[in-house]
């Protein structure tokens, strides 16, 4: 779904990974938890700033992991939350929206995804 057209002239800056609600979401990178919160489009979100300042964005979560704290360091593979359909995904099946942003903008995150 990377690059697909969205409403209001937007493009899809990520990939959607469909999974049952509550499926654990693991970080694809080591780094600092830079954001835990909520926004209109992404719903419940977690942001991690990885090496080189690359920002990893995890959205539509049911909830973040209980022990996750902003400004804390995590390793790749750490539990960061659980699949849901929050934000503008309320009418869709549960899924994780995963986006990656460099200083130049959004990049296709698909190559960074791997099975644990």
Can you say where each PLM-predicted feature lies in the sequence?
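Zn2+-dependent peptidoglycan hydrolase active-site motif and core
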Residues: 27-69, 92-97
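Conserved, short, structured surface segments that act as functional micro-motifs
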Residues: 45-49, 72-116
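Short acidic/polar mixed-charge low-complexity motifs
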Residues: 23, 52-55, 105-106
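A generic structural signal for solvent-exposed, polar alpha-helical segments
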Residues: 8, 63-66, 103-104
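Non-catalytic surface loops within mature trypsin-like serine protease
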Residues: 19-21, 62-63, 102, 115
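Surface-exposed, glycine-biased beta-strand/turn segments
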Residues: 1-44, 75-76, 85, 107-110
């Amino acid at each position: 779904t990377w690059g697909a057209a969205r409403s209001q002239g937007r493009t899809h800056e990520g990939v959607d990974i469909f999974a049952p609600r509550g499926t654990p979401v693991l970080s694809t990178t080591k780094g600092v938890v830079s954001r835990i919160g909520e926004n209109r489009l992404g719903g419940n979100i977690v942001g991690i700033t990885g090496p080189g300042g690359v920002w990893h964005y995890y959205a539509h979560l049911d909830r973040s992991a209980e022990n996750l704290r902003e400004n804390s360091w995590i390793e790749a593979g750490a539990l960061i939350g659980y699949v849901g359909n929050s934000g503008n995904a309320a009418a869709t099946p549960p899924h994780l929206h995963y986006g990656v942003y460099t200083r130049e903008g959004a990049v296709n995150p698909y190559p960074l995804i791997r099975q644990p």
